[in-house]
Amino acid sequence: MCEGRKLNKQKNKGDKAEREAAELLTKVTGFECKRTLAAGIPDDVGDIVGIPDCVIQVANYKDTSTACLKKPREVESQRENAKAKYAASMVRWRGGNWRVVLTVEQFNRFLQ
């Protein structure tokens, strides 16, 4: 498979996961959640918007352990860029199951 096709396939997989995450968050929270469509730009503010004062980063990695370690750190800088109080990462697991992943500090911020 050529490199361009591989990158496009990964982007499509990520876009689909972001749409799924936005739909799920809308359903469970009652907030109108949407994709930001601004991934990778300087001053990135996360993948999903709609939950007040919260930044959401989405990951759909084959290696979910890597996603659980990497994404909570990345979303923290996005939280700062957005000047939001809260940040969380949503990781898609095989079979379409989702988990919200936080650092201990991010979890504590939710408790305050």
Regions found by a protein language model. Give the residues of each.
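Catalytic phosphate/metal-binding cores of nucleic-acid and nucleotide-processing enzymes, i.e., regions
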Residues: 1-112
